Amino acid sequence: MADPIVHPGVHRPEFSAPLHARAEIIATLRAALGKPNTTLVGAAIGTGMAAQAASRGGADFILALNAGRLRSMGAPSIFSLLALRKSNDFVLDFAQSEILPFVKVPVFFGASAFDPRCSIEAELERIADAGFGAIVNFPTSIFLDGRFRADIEGAGLGFQRELEMLRAAQKRNMATLAYVRTVAEAQQAATAGVDIINLNLGWNVGGTVGSRTELSLRQAAEYAKIIFRQIRAISEDTLCVLEGGPIVSPDQMYEVSALSKADGYIGGSTIDRVPLEASMEQITSAFKSVGTLQKRIDELERQLEHVQREYSIVGRSPSIQQIKQRIEKLAASSLPVMITGQAGTGKKLLARGIHEAARRSGSKLISSEDASGESLFGFAPSEGGRKVLGLLQYHPKATLLIESVECLCVDAQERLIEVIETGAYRRLGDNERGRFEGRLILASTRPLPELGSSGQLIPALESRLAPGHVFLPPLCDRLEDLPLLAEHFLQALRKDRRSRKLSVDHSAYRVLMTYGWPENIRELRSVLETAAIRCEGDWIKSEHLPPLGDANADAPHPHPGEEREWILDALQRHRFRRGEAARYLGISRKTLYNKMRVYGLPLQPRERS
């Protein structure tokens, strides 16, 4: 066995099984699973470089497998079943020297039970003494079939021996993970009390040496849901994860996990071989065509600037795309626009975008928060007094933004209706009329229907504002826009302060993507500005971020019962077509999936009996 690699200047911690004892490992994984917008991710790899990269990328645990090592040598994963080397010696050689000293997440040792000459207890003692606190049955007999599988099982070297190994590992206080493929295997593993059960959907597709599969994503999800239901009926505490088959991208992983109610995903080829092949091809091609590539970069940067300028709203999520389409139509009309959304979602920026899109010559954007209406309409002087001009008279062609519209008194709301309907207004204190030829934009932090039902808006005004209503979703409902928003804010910061170009590191993104953002994009900008001051290099990392609280406790949420009915109504309206329902609700499809899981809503309409 090779001596552990020790890099100069890197401290190698002393690892032993008690440091990653069974209870500690499972508690760590459950804590990670409890964070918002989080799915457990395991990386099944075979080199120290891959393990460190996966750990930096946020992997919750590592599987050290002979298949991972073979992939790094250019062979497909299926070669792991061939008797090329003594598998446990092979894995121990690289995992102890390259992986254990340099990652802080739990490492599951891929242990083979095929060799009848090896005592299970002796192998486990050797693995535990090397510092491993967790074990997984790999290579495994579940990939065998037909007569060969029957012969292996008949010789007592198949899946039952693997379960015996996992049970023995638990007695040594080691965490256990079982590979399964069938309902029967899953039930046996659950009965054995295995901590994590990984449903393997077949060898991975994708890349140059990927396998083929006839299994669709939906079929994979439905099969996994059946398996996981069986597991949880036996052992509700068992963590259920999946791997392989048709899943080759994060989006596909999320779709299958959401539909099947999986706790997580294990990536093997999808984490090392497939992206490595693609990235090496791309970087080699980039070196060969650097001039052409730079032109493409310049073009993409121009496109990014265009996206950022478009109506002053940054993002490409479905809800934001829908808002942009709606704004394009509203900007070309004379309808009053009513913008609602939580504080900090960018209502004033959106108002400016609508104003600029309308291209009214000589027009300014003027804002008002006057509850009495005096600054809007002006008022006639009393005897000996002085006449006061209102904004409508002083800026007759401006775009007028009325913030916190619900604070307007009833008289001011009635006068506003007259402006909307006729373009005429009356000053307070007399009946003298003036003409307003500009644009009205109104804003509130409360939903429009709520403003009407609570009596804060008179019904006539609510009905006039409904056709031009635009709802800005909170940042927590469009987290897919966060990277683009971060780039936008850092680019603006660079221009304002003439500072260097900054980018957000993956470690910082992991923190940002799991935060609830109660103050929305306003808070994101503040966080990035603080991080930019703390950062001395070119990359903002997690340690540069200011402390972020638990937004999920503070952020306003609708009553669960009301929100459930609201979502169910949208699904029924659109015959459970989730993409259309999400667009109707103004949230992302991912957010809709999450909320459906939380409220136990069916993924398709129930058949009537």
Curated annotation (Swiss-Prot):
Pfam families named in the record: HTH_8, PEP_hydrolase, Sigma54_activat
Domain Sigma-54 factor interaction: 313-533
Residues annotated to bind ATP: H395, P396, K397, A398, T399, L400, L401, I402, E403, S404
MF terms in GO: ATP binding; ATP hydrolysis activity; sequence-specific DNA binding
Keyword tags: ATP-binding, DNA-binding, Nucleotide-binding, Plasmid, Transcription, Transcription regulation, Two-component regulatory system
Any Gene Ontology biological process: regulation of DNA-templated transcription
DNA-binding region(s), chain positions: 578-597
Listed PANTHER family: UPF0261 DOMAIN PROTEIN (AFU_ORTHOLOGUE AFUA_1G10120)
Function: Probable transcriptional regulator that acts in conjunction with sigma-54.
Name used for this protein in its record: Putative transcriptional regulatory protein y4pA
Species of the source: Sinorhizobium fredii (strain NBRC 101917 / NGR234)
